[in-house]
Structures are given as structure tokens and as C-alpha cells.
């Protein structure tokens, strides 16, 4: 069986709908079972309530991202890292808009999300491989676990999470997909459904094959109604830059999509 792992939807309803439709299409063909989300359901696009409602309607369990927990607890800032004063300003605008427009029931749903989830595909026996889900890292959901982190850093995080040889830990937050194995543990960044930053505008998620042992890790990209998302942002009071970022896949020079 394969698990579908999605992360960083960021209120992009058209992207989420397309990803869930793709997962549904693969259920029998690719033996896709449960779907889990790795947080940051809200922020940056105008559908926070609709995204959280759809996640709950579909019975998709998951964890809190930094955006979810800060909105739910009325913090002053989302805990996002900005690389310029302008980016910091945009971050504050998005966070303020989300807090102002989110419904009480949505806020409550975000508040109920746990920090971490541990899954055992074949029962609860500790000899089975474990899949651990966090948003940023086992220590902080605001920590950026990028692909250039050292093997020693990965080993430290695995030890902190209590992982053993054959286990897998999945996370998001950076919006850039990658995977590697260090000391027998698989490390997987799922990328982003609703706000990719790797130059590819398409929504991204991961399929993890899990049984007696962890098998393949497949990165999936899905085209969605980008113009609907762009139009939704432009019709809201959110900055037009967020629409431009969606078109460019989060980078000034988007990659060529095959």
C-alpha cells in the first residue's frame, strides 16, 4: 500500500482539489490508501475556510504547520523566514488577512492539530517500520530542513525523533521536494501543494510505499487551474505578488515544465 503525503496547501483550493482528484484516480491503479497532511493549510491565498473544510470532509488526518498553530493561537507573526524587508512586509499582510478572514470553526480545527504523527503501516509492533510526520523538524515546526543540510544534521534529527534503521521521516515547510537516506533512515520533503518554490508551478505531493518495509518514494506533480487561483488572489485584498509567485513556482526563473 502507498500513503499519499501532502503539505503546505496554503489556502490554495484549486491546487488541493486537483491533488485530491489525482490521488483518487490512483487509488486502485497504484494501491493508494490513506492520505495525510503535514500542515500549513492556510495563508497566502483566499480560501482558508474552504481548504480546512475539504480536508475535514475527506477525513484527512494531519499535523499543524507553523502557520496553522500561530493563527490558531493568535500570535503576532507566522514564524515564517523572510529574505528581505519587502518579503517580511508581504508575510505580515498575508498573516493579517488570514487572521481577519478565518472562521471560528476553522481556527478551532487548526488549534486541534497535533505537532507530530507516527504511523506503522503493518500494525503497532515496534519492529515494524515507522513513518513520522512533522512540519519543519522534530524539534520546531519553524525550522527549515533544506536539502543542503549535512548528514550529521539528519542523523541528529533522526535520533531526536527516536527513529531507527528502516524508518522514514517526512516533512514540508520549505516548499522544495527532496529525499535521501542517511544511516538507514529515509528523509523526505514532500514539497508544496499550494505554493511551490522549486520553479515548477504545479502542485506537488509524495507517494510512499509502505509494508513490511519502506519501499519507493514517488514525487508527483499535478497541473491545476492556475488562473482560478490567480484570479482569486487578485479579487481579494491579498498582494498581487502572491499570484505572480504561483505562476513562477516561487522563483524568478521558473523551470520548463515538460
Language-model-derived ranges and their functions:
Residues 148-188:
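Anionic-ligand binding region
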Residues 1-60:
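N-terminal active-site segment of His-dependent metallophosphoesterases
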Residues 10-15, 43-46, 67-73, 168-181, ...:
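Active-site environment of divalent metal-dependent phosphoester hydrolases
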Residues 180-258:
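Acidic, His/Gly-rich catalytic cores of divalent-metal-dependent hydrolytic chemistry
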Residues 6-7, 35-40, 61-66, 134, ...:
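Active-site neighborhood of phospho(di)ester-bond hydrolases with catalytic His/Asp-centered motifs
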Residues 51, 58-118, 128, 140, ...:
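Active-site neighborhood of divalent metal-dependent phosphoester bond hydrolases
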Residues 23-32, 121-128, 161-165, 207, ...:
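Glycine-rich phosphate-binding loop signature in dinucleotide/nucleotide-binding domains
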Residues 1-4, 119-132, 182-186, 215:
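Beta-strand-turn-beta hairpins that frame and shape the catalytic cleft
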Amino acid at each position: 500500500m502507498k500513503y499519499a503525503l501532502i503539505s503546505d496547501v496554503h489556502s490554495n483550493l484549486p491546487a488541493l482539489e486537483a491533488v485530491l482528484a489525482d490521488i483518487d484516480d490512483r487509488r486502485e491503479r497504484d494501491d493508494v490508501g490513506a492520505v495525510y497532511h503535514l500542515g500549513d493549510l492556510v495563508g497566502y491565498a483566499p480560501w482558508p475556510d474552504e481548504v480546512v473544510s475539504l480536508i475535514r470532509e475527506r477525513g484527512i488526518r494531519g499535523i499543524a504547520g507553523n502557520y496553522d498553530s500561530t493563527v490558531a493561537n493568535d500570535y503576532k507573526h507566522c514564524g515564517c523566514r523572510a529574505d528581505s524587508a519587502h518579503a517580511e512586509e508581504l508575510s505580515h499582510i498575508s498573516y493579517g488577512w488570514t487572521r481577519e478572514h478565518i472562521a471560528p470553526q476553522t481556527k478551532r480545527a487548526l488549534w486541534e492539530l497535533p505537532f507530530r504523527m507516527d504511523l506503522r503501516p503493518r500494525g503497532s509492533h515496534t519492529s515494524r517500520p515507522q513513518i513520522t510526520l512533522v512540519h519543519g523538524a522534530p524539534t520546531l515546526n519553524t525550522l527549515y530542513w533544506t536539502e543542503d543540510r549535512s548528514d550529521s544534521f539528519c542523523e541528529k534529527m533522526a535520533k531526536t525523533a527516536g527513529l531507527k534503521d528502516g524508518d522514514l521521516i517526512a516533512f514540508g515547510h520549505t516548499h522544495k521536494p527532496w529525499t535521501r537516506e542517511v544511516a538507514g533512515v529515509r528523509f523526505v520533503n514532500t514539497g508544496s501543494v499550494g505554493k511551490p518554490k522549486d520553479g515548477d508551478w504545479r502542485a506537488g505531493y509524495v507517494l510512499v510505499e509502505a509494508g513490511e518495509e519502506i519501499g519507493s518514494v514517488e514525487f508527483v506533480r499535478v497541473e491545476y487551474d492556475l488562473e482560478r487561483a490567480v484570479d482569486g488572489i487578485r479579487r481579494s485584498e491579498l498582494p498581487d505578488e502572491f499570484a505572480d509567485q504561483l505562476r513562477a513556482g516561487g522563483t524568478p526563473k521558473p523551470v520548463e515544465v515538460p
